[in-house]
Amino acid sequence: YTNTNIKTPTNIKTKATLINKDGDILYSHYGNNMGDPLKSVIEIVKDVYSKMPEKAYIAKSTATGYGEHLIKAALGVDFGEIETMAHYKAAEKILPGVEFILDIGGQDMKCMRVKDGEIESILLNEACSSGCGSFIQNFANALGMQPEEFAQIGLSAKSPVDLGSRCTVFMNSRVKQAQKEGASVADISAGLSYSVVKNALFKVIKIRDPKQMGEKIIVQGGTFLNNSVLRAFELTCGREVVRPDKAGLMGAYGSALVALSRDDGKGSTLAPLEKLENFTIQKTTARCGRCSNNCLLTISKFADGTRYITNNRCERGAGLG
């Protein structure tokens, strides 16, 4: 008995989890999609099928993230879920009564305040990556280091460089200046970790007092797998927080929990292995012409006749193709 989720963002990562009826993770994937999330998801699902015991089956499936609708149309995924709700479901499962959730991914950031079991407010930052994981990764690459190695070195910093929380352009200049002044790689790494945290707390969330976060705090997202960022957060806000061991999979895990909660015993509509082995997609373009926007639509046609339309700026173009 299994429920599966696929988180399909438009950035470089695709995540997936497979759980049993008790919510335990049986299988997970966290990796680059090389710019083709649909192909990545197909390979993940095929891998799941190949590893399932003979009598096991997929009970229900859920997709979330920016690629949700494409994956649903292409692969027959049962449900879609709003990404913030998926993250909340996972956080509540791990820390019942959670009051504050901060998720920092590779290119975006989201913060949720929870009161009495309901999401009270949501803050998002998708316009600038200066406070996200790709920001640190780029600096690590520039220094010829792996992000994991760069993060670990930051834990041994003696005098973290104060880099502020400005945009990447200014930060590049500040890092170069720090290097000229003799700052160590460890101090630069720790300084960047503090910058990520300060950007989240003081620019995105605009928090004035750490007490506003409550007592039950979860941090998640791939960026918090960086121990230096985790420690910088704890020192900045003056309290311990919970970082799940599945911090980079929380959206996928939460959506799998959604699939579990919606299981009606009728089985899943997720494409079987035979269909995935023969999967094809044909893309064409067409002008809508149903309103003054005159959108140039991209029409994706799948082998079973299903169509998925993008680039329409209103609902009138959704039925073409």
Model-found features: residue ranges?
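Adenine-nucleotide phosphate-binding core of ATP-dependent small-molecule kinases
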Residues: 173-202
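Gly/Thr-rich phosphate-binding beta-strand-loop-beta motif of the actin/hexokinase/Hsp70
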Residues: 1-24, 98-118, 287, 291, ...
